[in-house]
Each structure stands twice: as structure tokens, then as C-alpha cells.
UniProtKB/Swiss-Prot annotation:
Role noted for this protein: Catalyzes the GTP-dependent phosphorylation of the 3'-hydroxyl group of dephosphocoenzyme A to form coenzyme A (CoA).
Biological source species: Caldivirga maquilingensis (strain ATCC 700844 / DSM 13496 / JCM 10307 / IC-167)
Name this polypeptide is given: GTP-dependent dephospho-CoA kinase
GO molecular function annotations of the record: GTP binding; kinase activity
Signal peptide: none
Keywords assigned: Coenzyme A biosynthesis, GTP-binding, Kinase, Nucleotide-binding, Transferase
Similarity section: Belongs to the GTP-dependent DPCK family.
Pfam families the UniProt entry points to: DUF359 (PF04019)
Keyword Transferase appears in the UniProt entry: yes
Any Gene Ontology biological process: coenzyme A biosynthetic process
């Protein structure tokens, strides 16, 4: 199947998209470097070891004030349209197309492969052609249990999501806000079936 034919999982409404902008999970209302230092302490408290970041600014801040993420998801732009240059592009690099307000089928598969590479000792970068925000969902769903996912909100919060079952279930609930036809596409995605969906 070519990239142009990959099904898209489209959030149904403004309300559904707005839910992803809420500071749920562990929200840190601080600017860097303070926000990163707090996240670091929480990582230690939760005994997390894998850092996954979603977003260019968060990825740069974590690398600057802590250490390089094991997995980062970036689109080389900020919300204001500023181009971000990442000098450390070594390691495994994936590219995926993901249009605004969508989740591509391919993003789940690439995220799973990315974590497999991380567990093999590689640093991984996923470069998104489009918008990376919603890839926080597969970043949580596909993450090993010792992972912490970090992403930023335009309201200024840094959000930390430990990859535990409770937060994975929350992400699955967000996915129920997809249109019916899109939910059928989602049901047929192997990565989501692994979390308990049954094909009908």
C-alpha cells in the first residue's frame, strides 16, 4: 500500500481535539529549565528509564537541560512556524507523513518499530511530515512500561505520561471519539488490537 493510500484516523470534533490539549496526567506548570528538572525527579521517583519526547521544543529542552531523549518525535517546526535545527541526527531515523488533526495508520507501526530499536540500545528520531502533536497517542500506547513520554502544551505546561496501563486505557478512550468509519479502520490496526480491541 502506498503512503497516499494509508488510512487516516481523523478526530471527529473540536471537542475531541480540545481534550488532547488538556493538561492531564502529570502536568508541570513551569518554564525550562525548572520544568525539566521536575520531570527528571519524577522519572527517578517512578523508576523510569526510557525518555520519549513529542515536539521540537520539548525535545531540545530535554537534551539541553537533562540528556538526549531515547526517542523523539519532531516535525522541525514550532507552533509559531519557526524552523528548528537539530544538530544531533545520528541514530535511527524514521519519516512518516501525518496530516494535521489526524493519526496515520503508519504512525502506530513506526512507533512500535522505534521502541524496538530503543530497546536494542539505539537512539531514535521520528521526523513527521505534517503535524506531530497527536503522535503522543501511539507514543503512549506502544511504549514499554519503563518509559516516560514528555510533550508540551501551548498553554505552557510540560506533560509527563508514565507508560502504565491506566494512561494507556485513557488514550484508548480518546480514540473512541473517532468517527464510526474511522473506528473500524482503527479496530483493524494490529497495534490497537494488542490492547484488547476485538474485530467485529
Amino acid at each position: 500500500m502506498s503512503e497516499t493510500n494509508h488510512p487516516r484516523l481523523i478526530l471527529r470534533s473540536k471537542r475531541a481535539r480540545a481534550l488532547m490539549a488538556l493538561p492531564f496526567a502529570i502536568s508541570i506548570p513551569r518554564d525550562p529549565p525548572d520544568s525539566i528538572m521536575i520531570a527528571r525527579e519524577l522519572f527517578n521517583d517512578f523508576k523510569l528509564s526510557i525518555i520519549a519526547t513529542v515536539g521540537d521544543v520539548v525535545s531540545l529542552n530535554v537534551a539541553t537541560y537533562w540528556r538526549r531523549p531515547d526517542l523523539r518525535v519532531i516535525d522541525l517546526n514550532t507552533r509559531r512556524g519557526t524552523v528548528i535545527q537539530h544538530s544531533d541526527m545520528d541514530g535511527v531515523v524514521y519519516r512518516v507523513r501525518n496530516e494535521r488533526s489526524t493519526l496515520s495508520y503508519e504512525s502506530f507501526n513506526i512507533m512500535r518499530s522505534a521502541y524496538a530499536n530503543v530497546l536494542s540500545g539505539n537512539r531514535v528520531t521520528i521526523i513527521v511530515d505534517g503535524e506531530e502533536d497527536l503522535l503522543a497517542i501511539p507514543a503512549v500506547l506502544e511504549a514499554p512500561g519503563n518509559t516516560g513520554i514528555l510533550y508540551g502544551l501551548y498553554t505552557g505546561y510540560l506533560v509527563l505520561i508514565p507508560a502504565v496501563n491506566e494512561y494507556k486505557i485513557l488514550m484508548l478512550k480518546l480514540l473512541t471519539l473517532l468517527d464510526r468509519d474511522e473506528c473500524e479502520t482503527l479496530r483493524n490496526c494490529n497495534s490497537v488490537n494488542n490492547y484488547g480491541w476485538k474485530n467485529s
